[in-house]
């Protein structure tokens, strides 16, 4: 990045790859104006940042799990764990209540962050994986693209489930924007 090489000190290549797939599981007419519909959505994104030689990156240019779009519910990670490789995966079961306006969702997220792209491929283990799941409400209006969710967060450490709070399941409120790829 940077337009002025003499003044700017951080130069890097950033790569983002995204994939989405949708399956209609059920589309049953209930009335003349409404169908009971369930859609399964699978979303994945893989991001890497590669600094140029002799360039040090500040934390503001590194990747992180933000708790709103990646690893929903993990809102405290962005300030303590940043890296140069991020893989975010989501599976959602969506039920449109008012198509194009409002739907009910259930999500399961898996987010992985590593300090370097090389370590992402060579040193990945279960302690690097952050899971979250829960129900949510999605507003699909372009003027009001909000999502309200309840998220439960955990990791699998040494083969055992470790809840984020250290005690057990705890629902956390998450407010996010409903961003669609076009």
Question: Model-derived features: where do they sit?
Answer:
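C-terminal outer-membrane beta-barrel translocator/porin domains of Gram-negative envelope proteins
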Residues: 1-101, 106-118, 122, 163, ...
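Short, well-ordered loop/turn and helix-capping segments at boundaries between secondary-structure elements
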Residues: 24-25, 150, 180
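Short basic/hydrophobic patches in alpha-helices and adjacent helix-turn junctions
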Residues: 92-96, 135-140
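Conserved active-site loop/cleft motifs that coordinate metal ions or position small ligands
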Residues: 103-107, 145-152
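C-terminal beta-signal and adjacent terminal beta-strands/loops
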Residues: 109-124, 141-143, 154-160, 181
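Short beta-alpha connecting loops at secondary-structure transitions
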Residues: 118, 130-131, 151, 155-163, ...
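A short alpha/beta connector and helix-capping loop motif
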Residues: 119-135
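Outer-membrane beta-barrel "beta-signal"
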Residues: 139-144, 167-182
